[in-house]
């Protein structure tokens, strides 16, 4: 299990991501006066610049949003679906939809991703490993090693268009015209929508636990949580995990992805998981600078994503958050969330090399208006990856 730092500044603002460059972008958004939604948009778009193996404009994902003013948790579903042998690019639509919760101008949330894409991006250790493990990459990518630099200027041009004209240019404008010439259905691009809905929830000793809706992998977690609440169903829960692992053995590559977390001083909390459906998606680099996603069906793509958001009874404060990509991370996730023997026994069945998630725990809730979770020393942040 590899650990990553959690960045907390300014006061009562927290961001989490596996790449320090992505974390820095999230922090920068808070320093500009943005909130958790603004930071999340910026981090998701930046991740596609620096870690295109696991995220990007070609992919999609799931978010959960806790707005204390509403007293409920919403799911933002922007999963990609099959489209002419490629996955429908969904990230831009998801990020633009999330901006409804933001405070900054849309352009301000994309400035850093554009700036980084205009530069030659340094290949991180994680990206170098992904390049080594990926088969069928374009030669100019396959030869890259840690510390090398790669041009993302084509992506920068695409991001600039999205920044200036909104996500509409990507799905029904200049960018979509180019995508339709490379195999995407112009009609499907035009009709694609990200959707908001109420998250699934279950009662807990501390309050409630929320799961994205409708995600197949989250339905599994929902059922596992319920089973673990009943000691008589402990073995049933364990067998469920083992059965899922056996069933998904051929889909392990699709477990690669990224997760992000952001919380602000006003109590808005956003947690997201994204993926290309495999390392570098289907390995096709579009002229617009991003890799197309793997062409999994919507039903299969739903099994790649999960996150849990545990709240107080009034649904105004988060006690714990965990997010990740891939069914193999569920055992560790449940173990971190619950800290009990049943969850730990399930955790013993994990495959560590496939786990990939982030976690935040605040025993007294986060954020407390007068004191942050970190100041209370009730925080656990974990990133596990390949």
Regions found by a protein language model. Give the residues of each.
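Cofactor-centric catalytic regions
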Residues: 194, 200, 353-386
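Proteins synthesized as precursors that undergo proteolytic processing into mature forms
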Residues: 3-141, 156-157, 163, 172, ...
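Ordered hydrophobic segments in well-structured contexts
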Residues: 210, 320, 380-381
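Polar low-complexity intrinsically disordered regions
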Residues: 1-4, 386
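Accessory "access/gating" subregions that flank catalytic or transport cores
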Residues: 14, 30-32, 51, 133-214
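Acidic/polar residues at beta-strand termini and the immediately following turn/coil
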Residues: 67, 77, 152, 312, ...
